């Protein structure tokens, strides 16, 4: 091989190698920022992806959506710490959060929390979002929540009418 072709081959090989390394680093960085969406049942039992059941690992970042279990909200009087249970159609997952909860956060309402799985059924959230009206629900959660009766806030807090 003549020197000119050899030099050209080395330059092209180096360019391909640099581009491949850059693409690999970008994909690695993007994979670190992915927060997969789970329901409480999927956190405990795993999420079916094709033929494989994927169970989230302790330490994994994720988003979880479900209904806040009535009577499960526990607030710390000394700080902004709060914990509550989430449920869909199956197991219960406990969520801990340090901070102010959204104004629309209520027991029996749907929420989405972003955080880290710290135990098999416990999530340390760094963000909690409440749905903005009675009808909104993320599509993934709506699909999983079919069949669960939702009580509207007006019905939950209304007083019985007395007829005279």
Curated annotation (Swiss-Prot):
It is found in: Cell inner membrane. It is a single-pass type II membrane protein. InterPro entries: CcmE (IPR004329), CcmE-like_sf (IPR036127), NA-bd_OB-fold (IPR012340). Residues 1-8 are cytoplasmic. Belongs to the CcmE/CycJ family. It comes from the Bacteria. Keywords: Cell inner membrane, Cell membrane, Cytochrome c-type biogenesis, Heme, Iron, Membrane, Metal-binding, Signal-anchor, Transmembrane, Transmembrane helix. Heme binds at residues 132, 136. GO terms for cellular component: plasma membrane. One of its GO terms (molecular function) is heme binding. Residues 30-164 are periplasmic. GO terms for biological process: cytochrome complex assembly. The chain crosses the membrane at residues 9-29. This is Cytochrome c-type biogenesis protein CcmE.
């Amino acid at each position: 091989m003549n020197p000119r072709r050899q030099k050209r081959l080395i330059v092209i090989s180096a360019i391909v190698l640099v581009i491949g390394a850059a693409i690999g680093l970008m994909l690695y960085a993007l994979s670190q920022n992915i927060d997969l969406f789970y329901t409480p049942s999927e956190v405990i039992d795993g999420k079916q992806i094709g033929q494989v059941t994927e169970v989230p690992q302790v330490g994994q970042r994720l988003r979880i959506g479900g209904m806040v279990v009535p009577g499960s909200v526990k607030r710390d009087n000394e700080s902004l710490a709060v914990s509550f249970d989430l449920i869909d159609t199956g197991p219960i997952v406990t969520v801990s959060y340090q901070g102010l909860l959204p104004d629309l956060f209520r027991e029996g309402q749907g929420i989405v929390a972003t955080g880290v799985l710290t135990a098999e059924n416990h999530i340390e959230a760094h963000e909690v979002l409440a749905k903005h009206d009675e009808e909104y629900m993320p599509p993934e959660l709506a699909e999983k929540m079919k069949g669960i009766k939702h009580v509207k806030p007006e019905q939950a807090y209304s007083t019985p009418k007395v007829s005279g």
